Amino acid sequence: MARAVGIDLGTTNSVVSVLEGGDPVVVANSEGSRTTPSTVAFARNGEVLVGQPAKNQAVTNVDRTIRSVKRHMGSDWSIEIDGKKYTAQEISARVLMKLKRDAEAYLGEDITDAVITTPAYFNDAQRQATKEAGQIAGLNVLRIVNEPTAAALAYGLDKGEREQTILVFDLGGGTFDVSLLEIGEGVVEVRATSGDNHLGGDDWDDRIVNWLVDKFKGTSGIDLTKDKMAMQRLREAAEKAKIELSSSQSTSVNLPYITVDSDKNPLFLDEQLIRAEFQRITQDLLDRTRQPFQSVVKDAGISVSEIDHVVLVGGSTRMPAVTDLVKELTGGKEPNKGVNPDEVVAVGAALQAGVLKGEVKDVLLLDVTPLSLGIETKGGVMTKLIERNTTIPTKRSETFTTADDNQPSVQIQVYQGEREIASHNKLLGSFELTGIPPAPRGVPQIEVTFDIDANGIVHVTAKDKGTGKENTIKIQEGSGLSKEEIDRMVKDAEAHAEEDRKRREEADVRNQAETLVYQTEKFVKEQRETENGSRVPEDTLNKVEAAVAEAKTALGGTDISAIKSAMEKLGQDSQALGQAIYEATQAASKVGGEASAPGGSNSTDDVVDAEVVDDERESK
């Protein structure tokens, strides 16, 4: 049986691991290192360099060297080299191909199967892009696994049978995740996860670069940001300085011949950076890790004191300020020192590959979806079908209905996020279900099913229960999330919770009022068109019609309290209408049956009180 590898496809560095005799082994690359820089360069002679060789020539080949491409996964980003455009998936595939070659050289056999990790907070488009990168690299991607989950799997499997709660704090080169997991008796279950897809070691490096640029400009008057080669040298020096400050109180940044002055005289950069200053200029970055931590503890429904172990993942967790913050957040709990933060994710991925291949027995991995999923319904409301932190794989269905009479089709718009208003979330994709037979609004029943597979990739189906017609979409389009979108998604939901609540309440009230107006109007019309004349007194019908007119006027405005008031009045008058027809029927016949009150309709027990917006979003 072909071997399967576990791959940690990182922003700055990547690692590949494989099971040997049931134990995971990290594979050294052809340069002899256990980590491979996620850097790709296109040499001018046509050669494609990957890893350390690409990183080594970056200064002299700035425009043709790509780093940190993981931050562009799931977006429409591309780079043009020699007239050809390369997507983020293609660049990532180059890194995966090198890892694949190195693993094949180590094992002496071909590798086709792999488990690849992604940040827990990656959205659907980003996960799909990662899978595509694997396919481009010639790999059969068995599973996409969340990085903190893989780390917990590597850490927790040999910790005995007692159930334990583990916090994984994962700060890598470009992404940040925090997850709470329970491990016991071979089961690894994710309780909650949160994070920031645009926070990582690169951001700390950038602060040092900016600090050096400002210092140099202050002494020489020259702005180094206009010199690409100088900036590449600064980036490399900043990374080294950051690493040195993890073990020393100060570091020197000495870059001779960094640029020349107006007289073509060479200039040197020589600065001393102390740890305290480094921590001062990066404090706000560190503070951005607090909210996801607090969110995870809250979502998991536990107290900090219930956390048994803290596992640090990612090279950026070596910074003393990060370690100190984690200790502060966990009430003084010392992080576990028994795992290599650079390698533990790949080790966990290899173990999961072993589980899928049957090499590792009696292990069950239960992961979660990091963000809620739903569709847009009438009023622009986000109707969630799957809540965040739901264990995957999972499948949920809800039945919706049409917004207009004789509506021939419905537009299903799929969103991911936590906001109450759909447009404030991430649009993953949309599709149309056509061929709905003519019928009054509220009669057709459209069943929408969300299916998330074990990779966290979403499939959505819409089916007309009446005709059996259905349409399915595998969410794979989408532009990915911008820097602002992803880290604001949950934070905005909390910051704007009150605003969202009011808008949702307004949408709900409008929907209820419109439905009542429609049903009452229809009932009055039927009474007036009765063959033998209506048994309801004319003044009662006129009174109800006046109430309908008032409700319509209120719906034309923006005063939600006026709509509520008009709806209450119409409801009372409608009840009087029902009472009048009941009394008239009783008087006419002793054997009388029950007549439908306004609003009566066929049983819709399974129908959610929301309506799918057709095509264009209705203006509010």
Curated annotation (Swiss-Prot):
Domain of life, per lineage: Bacteria
Modified residues (Phosphothreonine): T175
Record-annotated membrane-spanning stretches: none
Gene3D superfamilies in the cross-refs: 1.20.1270.10, 3.30.30.30, 3.30.420.40, Actin, Chain A, domain 4, Substrate Binding Domain Of DNAk, Chain A, domain 1
UniProt keyword list: ATP-binding, Chaperone, Nucleotide-binding, Phosphoprotein, Stress response
GO molecular function, one term: unfolded protein binding
Induction, per UniProt: By stress conditions e.g. heat shock.
Statement: the UniProt record of this protein carries the keyword Hydrolase: no
Ranges where the record places region Disordered: 588-620
Signal sequence residues: none
Family according to the record: Belongs to the heat shock protein 70 family.
Matches recorded under HAMAP family: DnaK
NCBIfam families for the chain: PRK00290.1, prok_dnaK
Free-text function comment from the UniProt entry: Acts as a chaperone.
Protein name (Swiss-Prot/TrEMBL): Chaperone protein DnaK
Species in which this protein is naturally found: Mycobacterium leprae (strain TN)
Species classification: Bacteria, Bacillati, Actinomycetota, Actinomycetes, Mycobacteriales
Name of encoding gene: dnaK
